[in-house]
Amino acid sequence: VREVTASVSGTGRQRTDTRYWDYGNPNATTTLVLVHGFRGDHHGLQLVVAELLGDDANPADLRIVAPDLPGFGGSAPLPGGVHSLAAYVDWLQEFVHVLAPAGRLVVLGHSFGSIVVAAAVADGLVTHDVILVNPIAAPALSGPRGVLTRLAVFYYWTAASLPDRWGYALLQNRAIVRIMSVSMAKTRDAGLRRWIHNQHDRYFSVFANRRVVMEAFAASISHDVSEFAAHIRQPTLLIAADKDDITPLAAQHRLQSLFPNATLRVINGVGHLIHYEKPKPAAAFIREFLAEDRPA
């Protein structure tokens, strides 16, 4: 793996440093760009990356690029300080432009990343294929456990209302992070649950400042993939879960019908953490999708 910093242009010709991790064969014929979810960073998708790359005896002809979203992980906030969906779309388009991958380009988004990717592709991001994992198929407040989303809205509103020091501390409160983690994990494997909680403890609070989190959260609950689906002509793979508390499975089927060319694959026994709990079947669906014949 190669750890790299890219200088990406933003509003007013200002530039921002985006940290990304470059896996696999740099000369591969296919480049897969990953966009992680809200409050995470590139670590969240590493199990899927490992499954996709294979082992040394059977390496995949694949390059995988996993940036940290601006303001999260190792990436600096966006220039201008506005972390709206439109700003993240502009950033992704510029990041791909700077990356300048050769050959086939595939862009994958998980959770909030699915909204960013869908909006960017609908806005003209040039990519051959699209993959959305745990896509936000409908407004978050309408999900099976919309009450939890409303509690999250109150939590972030409270964090924004407090003095900066106390608001920042509330956002990083380990007990609240643990509650979020417990509510999302569906596995009954005690060891896997501990590992998931550890990942959230380590990476869920690595953000630049309070404003970044507040603005990104507002973007994540104000939009969903269904707004952009009809404008995405590229072959699209949707990987959904039957126990996702944020988007019910029925909404995923409706979402599929909005795309001109989408395939829906459902993984059972998992919720919004496919990337942690079911990386093997997710990677298998991705490999199958990437191997499909495409019209010339």
What does each of the following model-derived ranges do?
Residues 166-231:
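Conserved alpha/beta-hydrolase catalytic His-Asp/Glu region
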